[in-house]
Amino acid sequence: MTLSRSPPGGPITTPAGILSRTLPALAGALAVGCVVSACGSEGKGPAPVKTCVSQTCIETVNVTDSGNPPDADTGRGAVDHEFAIGAYEITVGQYLGFLNSVARVPTSPATKALWVKPMQDTASYVSAGLIARTGSGTDADPFVYTEIPDIALGASSSRRGILNISWFSAARFANWLQNGATAAASTETGAYTLNGATSGVIARNPGALWWIPTEDEWYKAAYYDPTKPGDNKYWEYPTRSDALPTGEAFPGGVNSANYNAAMPELKKITPTGAYTSSVSHYGTYDQAGLLWEWNDAVYQDFEGVPTTRGLRGGSWSLGMINVSKFGPRDYEPTYDDDDTGFRLATTRK
């Protein structure tokens, strides 16, 4: 999907068959409607399926109902195929295994950039960082990556969402899975032909087995619900609700999320799936909070040159506009801030 960037508040034009919309749609973003518990949708979603590639296991949910219509409000969400998507964002533990497989003796700037120093730094949002790196990165003294645990979370510490992730790091993780998730698995070919690239806009290859979801795939997994009352089968928020989620500490209720600085200082990076009752129709968690998530949308600059990639969802740091279906964002694919993460899509399981 290629989108054209416009001045703030202006229209974003989209391909034929996708409706234009104006952003931000503040009136829609603040609408209050049917809450989950009042709509008969209360409870958890479908159980995830665990898929393991070598030693890396990812829990996914199937997104069915292919050929669904787009959202009447935004024109987003129509998908003509079935697929699976991560029930959760990629975690510290999963990313740690990736680093120790492919980035111990990095041979290119692209591989070295899979880890960035903020991952180990103390900050206002995390007590002591997430992943530490030691060593020199040479054959004689390879890098070793270790989790910096949050003792209070116990075994759930490694399930915290991994952050400071660029689009390129997410794409290399997808390639690694595609190629077997071993130390010998390439990060440069597979779902995406990267060949050392650290800039530019790169399309997904046909036949990908794991990939960064398209804007419509991500959107459908978050908001679509064929059982929703009324004509438009899309909720406004990824918690099966048309009411703004409550930003509060986990586990919360049926319409809660980690966004808008809801968690205490040093404890803002929560385990994925910690809001156990706040779930989409298909069974995804945390699309309303924890981290912004990369998608595969491509945005053009004012001269029509593709420059940026899409992000969606709420984050631990941001407020209500980004939580709703009316709040897409885009950044350069090198962007790797403290509230950017990702989940992957795959073939139906």
What are these regions (language model features)?
Residues 77, 84-215, 221-248, 300:
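Active-site microenvironments of metalloenzymes and redox enzymes
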Residues 2-3, 32-59:
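Bacterial Sec-dependent N-terminal signal peptides
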Residues 71, 295-305:
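Cytochrome P450 core scaffold surrounding the K-helix E-X-X-R motif
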Residues 1-20:
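N-terminal secretory signal peptides that target proteins for export/translocation
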